[in-house]
Amino acid sequence: RNLTPSKFRQLFGELSPAQLTIIKDNTSQHIAVAAGPGSGKTRLLVHKLASLLLMEDVKHEQLLMVTFSRAAATEFKKRLIELIGNAANFIEIKTFHSYCFDLLGKVGSIEKSQTIINMAVKKITSKDIEPNRITKNVLVIDEAQDMDAHEFELLKALMEHNEEMRVIAVGDDDQAIYGFRGSTVEAILSLEQYFHPLQTLYLTYNYRSHQLILDLANQLFPQ
């Protein structure tokens, strides 16, 4: 699909060259983005979802984004709606747990959430799930560094089920927010071990620090 130059500028004109490189990459099957604090990770992910829909031949039912909290999923959906409008409502943005509950056709509960990912992995690997339930061709992962061993096994199971699946994993390899639940920074680093070839890209510019410096300079040297 082709966007007019003016529409492209409207959607993506404020992105940095590094962010645009990731947006325009439509050939790499496996992409890992190491994004430092304040580097525009959320903006990148929202715009990558938009580019998959509007610039590539990805249908909304083929696209899944997973994150680690319902609050994050809600925020991503809100920002995507602001960017591309009503089309965003058809994109699945879920937590790992809610995706597994949907996959198995079960109602979510706190008790079941402890085991639902392992159950999903077993069902996928034993081919005990109806094929029409696993239809995703593109998987986008937020905070990939926070994947624990169970979530990483789910990722591998989905990849083995569909060897053509594209994976776009974005995270900070220096930070594991959910370390208390078994997550380690090895998750994002392990992508290179399991997924070949892997295109690794970096976002290092800290917009937040840059803005703090500008704000401080404005206070010290008012116009």
Feature locations, PLM:
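Conserved SAM-binding loop
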Residues: 65, 93, 140, 169, ...
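Conserved catalytic network of the ASCE P-loop NTPase/AAA+ motor domain
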Residues: 55-58, 85-86, 131-133, 147, ...
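Hydrophobic residues in beta-strands of the RecA-like P-loop NTPase core, especially within AAA+ ATPase
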Residues: 141-147, 171
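Conserved RecA-like helicase ATPase core segment
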Residues: 152-223
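Loop/turn-to-beta-strand initiation segments
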Residues: 63, 136-138, 163-168
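Structural preference for long, well-ordered alpha-helical segments in enzyme cores
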Residues: 45-49, 72, 76-80, 120-126, ...
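Conserved helicase/translocase P-loop NTPase motor core
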Residues: 18-19, 25-30, 93-138, 148-157
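P-loop NTPase Walker
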Residues: 1-109
